[in-house]
């Protein structure tokens, strides 16, 4: 049995979770699985599983790649020689959402740190970012119960000024995160995954930021949208 979790996993143990599934930390998964199902269990970070699935039969097939997953938070993973990087403690490549991208106006992240990418581009952060904009009450976003990527992109499509300013902030943050991953892990391909990546406007803006700011003397990293965002995690969990 295989399970993907939005947590830091090291040697079959969940060692850290940020806000969700806190009872998974230190839980004896092996004992539980044997007792409940009579079978061993394999645990994996969800972004790492998604990247592995895309490398097996998706947008990163036969390449060294990194992934940035945009959802409630921001997940990431990286691979070298077709193997997921984990490091000594399981965190290598997994904390892209918590790379610091902002110093002058640092926002508090759910992890407790300030300036994290996730605090500027995770779905959970969008509502607060939008409501702090001048003119929010008169903007298209004011009609949303809670501002998320769908509401933001709808506002952008309407030409709403506040939506456009928030979009620029968020897209720039994602571009910074992409550059950080490229500089850190030297991938041939950078995958972007998650519902917001279906926006061609967002993808263009991220690609432009990367093109203008990345330093890769060997050439340009190929930035792609995940082919199978709904199924790549399952494909990555298949044990060979």
Model-derived regions: residue spans:
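ATP-binding/phosphotransfer module of carbohydrate and carboxylate kinases, centering on a glycine-rich
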Residues: 1, 9-14, 31, 35-39, ...
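General beta-strand structural signal in soluble alpha/beta enzymes
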Residues: 41-45
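Short acidic loop-to-helix transition motifs that present clustered carboxylates
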Residues: 48-51
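A secondary-structure boundary/capping signal
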Residues: 4-5, 17, 70
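Short glycine-enriched, charge-decorated loop/helix-capping segments at active-site entrances
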Residues: 15-22
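Glycine-rich phosphate-binding loop of actin/hexokinase-like ATP-binding domains
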Residues: 63-120
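A structural motif shared across PLP-dependent enzymes of the aminotransferase-like
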Residues: 22-30
